[in-house]
Amino acid sequence: MRLPNKYALTFPERRPTPVRPLALEEIRRLDFAEPEFRRFPCLTLALESGRRGGLRPAVFNAANETAVKAFLEGRVRFTAIPRVIDRTLRAWDKTPVQDGRTLASILAADAWGRDAARRMMEKEKP
């Protein structure tokens, strides 16, 4: 994970790294483990949104991007991110429009999610 983390921390630049590129042909075995849902609550929210479908994944993504941006700007704590997403999704679940197969409906859900997440963050303290 060093290389993806480095890319995330130095984006949009690409800085040199002493880490060797991954050579899949050298790996003899890959081990997979159950996700740690308690440790990563946003994973639970993402999977639940995908299972429910409709426009909920678009709202999840919008709330996530908005909350992460606020964290990176120092406006909310890291631990606020899942709370903001969860509260945004709960508010979305109460709206009458839950499905849409057009680009316009997806963009509207995205805008709704961003606006709702911003309102949720007004209640959060950095």
Label for each model-derived stretch:
Residues 1-126:
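Catalytic, metal-anchored helix/loop core of enzyme active sites in primary metabolism
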